[in-house]
Amino acid sequence: MNNARPIHRALLSVSDKTGIVEFAKALAERGVELLSTGGTARLLAEQGLTVTEVSDYTGFPEMMDGRVKTLHPKVHGGILGRRGQDDAVMNTHGIQPIDMVVVNLYPFAQTVANPNCTLADAVENIDIGGPTMVRSAAKNHKDVAIVVNAHDYDRVIREMDANHNSLTLATRFDLAIAAFEHTAAYDGMIANYFGTLVPSYGDNKEGDEESKFPRTFNAQFIKKQDMRYGENSHQAAAFYVEANPQEASVATARQIQGKALSYNNIADTDAALECVKEFSEPACVIVKHANPCGVALGDDLLQAYNRAYQTDPTSAFGGIIAFNRELDGETARAIIERQFVEVIIAPKVSQAAIDIVAAKQNVRLLECGEWQGQTTGFDLKRVNGGLLVQDRDQGMVAQDDLQVVSTRQPSDAELKDALFCWKVAKYVKSNAIVYAKGDMTIGIGAGQMSRVYSAKIAGIKAADEGLEVAGSVMASDAFFPFRDGIDAAAEAGITCVIQPGGSMRDQEVIDAANEHGMAMIFTGMRHFRH
């Protein structure tokens, strides 16, 4: 049995009125009696629907500027009453069963997002009656349907039509889960907002400013897919996304073809896409194990790809390729004919490219949409027993921010390459060293415990691929603690170094650059990446 329950009476009270008129009309056409409150009732009545105001049903008026509307036994008794068990009590008190509750909540998130929002504004947008009805209906899903999302309206009507105006228990249970998720997210937003208005635990000094981070951290993500396994085959995994991601990303991407994305695919694709977003010129980023192994600019995507691949063809095998322009057929053909690739992602993919990549059905081809800058937010990192939370690293220097600390000034070409490889270094695991020349990476040294060894690896990789390091620019994601890194760079033929500065031995490092006739640029900004 599907334990279907017929829908005879529905209570509608929504802040977001998207689709509510059409939904209410569909319910009315199917003989459902409509109860409603406030603005929702007025809207439905204006559209010619017969609606009973909740205040008329309860015999108790709305009061306190609408703060008290539905908090009444005739409402909650009708929702919570167990059919076949509480019928006598309901009849004694004149409580009619309510079979469906359609509620969404005051727009708290939109209210507090307004920079001019006051505490009083926030308080008045904390919904009380709405969450109470939602939770009541979800608790009694055995008998009552709760609808909190407008995108479920059509689904509900279709099922009613297929089941003689009834909804199955499976559907009511699914709607109840969505309802509890809805109220959990809502309460989490409120707790986060109020939690930022006071100092964090342990910092209760008088006069402390508001905290950027709430006392408790509440976040909600929606499962997009289950995975075969996680980072390793013995780990279970799933991919969760924000409810409404605002920025084009791997989370918003549409998969055009290919096998299901793996855990590592998603992590690597994110690294590649976020790096390529840094560039305004046609760019290609190739990533392996979350590190760029080749990055280049070009007059078009084909040139950018060819140059990025040239940096490290060995590591590019089985890599992730990201572009910041529409993927064209010529570039797609060059990739497919040249190398094995796991994922290709671009803001848009041409039909010609789709047709070409289709020859390799296992290649995952993603279209993420155009991006308009970066959205603010937090980066999260799990540690045993805790969670590290920080701002996203959206910092990036412009030419005017740079400080030349060497005797020799960088040439225009060196300056351009310095800014290019500084952007790349931001996305390389620390300790990060990037060699670049002519808008392409020459060698990349990543993830070494010693900065000097990262530099050596960058040089070895360049030599292995027959690339000339002499005349290149070197970027370091953090300062040089000793001059040995500069001496090694000079020996390799590096002519310009860009780094944050800030070491106690900065002068020693600058002196080394001057001795070798190198230009040295300080950014004043570090880009550790762990």
Curated annotation (Swiss-Prot):
All residue ranges annotated as the MGS-like domain in the record: 1-148
Top-level taxon: Bacteria
GO MF terms held by the record: IMP cyclohydrolase activity; phosphoribosylaminoimidazolecarboxamide formyltransferase activity
Keywords recorded for this protein, A-Z: Hydrolase, Multifunctional enzyme, Purine biosynthesis, Transferase
Stored InterPro entries: AICAR_Tfase_dup_dom_sf (IPR024051), Cytidine_deaminase-like (IPR016193), MGS-like_dom (IPR011607), MGS-like_dom_sf (IPR036914), PurH-like (IPR002695)
Disulfide bonds: none
This protein's record includes keyword Phosphoprotein: no
Protein family according to the UniProt entry: Belongs to the PurH family.
Protein name listed in UniProt: Bifunctional purine biosynthesis protein PurH
Species assigned in the record: Vibrio cholerae serotype O1 (strain ATCC 39315 / El Tor Inaba N16961)
